[in-house]
Amino acid sequence: GVNARHMGLEFEVKARPAKWVEISAMLSLGSWKWDSDSVVGYAYDGYGQALAVDPATKMTYITDPGAADHQYAIINMKGINVGGSAQTTANLGVTFKPFKGFRIGAEYTLYDRNYAYYSFSGSNLAIGKTMNLLQPWRIPTAGQLDMRASYHFQIGGLNATLSGNINNLLNQ
């Protein structure tokens, strides 16, 4: 099996310094690393059938899963960062309520220590060999500014809300 260790701390705070304003902040600090070495990956064809190779002819043939001749590769990945999600995230937001029913706000989110997602296939594994996984590419630090507004009102005795969002306002 492949194991990963996900450790970290998360903090979140919300304040209302005045009746008409809310401020929120969040910080998430993580350490996500693969915790496995000598992981065995078996070879299968596109139909999910276990593969073996005849040593004399080098021809591939179908075998039983887990049989002695079932082809495999070994992957060492202990201590390598898990990719696909920022391991440090921070957020600061503010919402204003200038009059009854109306809200307008913005929030900025910072993403750091984000590593590229990766996967394995037959093109990057050598059957019968050991592959030592290298650290994935660290994506540059990035941020995103989002804005939102909403107006809550009644129409014909029913509650209604008109709202809009602009995600990634700065197009970064």
Show where each model-derived region lies.
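Residue-level signal for pocket-adjacent positions within structured domains
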Residues: 75-77, 132, 164, 170
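Solvent-exposed, glycine/polar-rich loop segments of beta-barrel outer-membrane systems
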Residues: 46-47, 125-132
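Outer-membrane beta-barrel domain signature
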Residues: 79-81, 135-138
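Short, functionally important structural connectors and interaction interfaces within domains
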Residues: 9, 74, 129, 161-162
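Gram-negative outer-membrane beta-barrel transporters
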Residues: 1-120
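Aromatic-anchored helix/helix-loop segment that forms the rim or "lid"
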Residues: 131-132, 138, 142
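C-terminal beta-signal and adjacent terminal beta-strands/loops
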Residues: 31, 109-126, 140, 144, ...
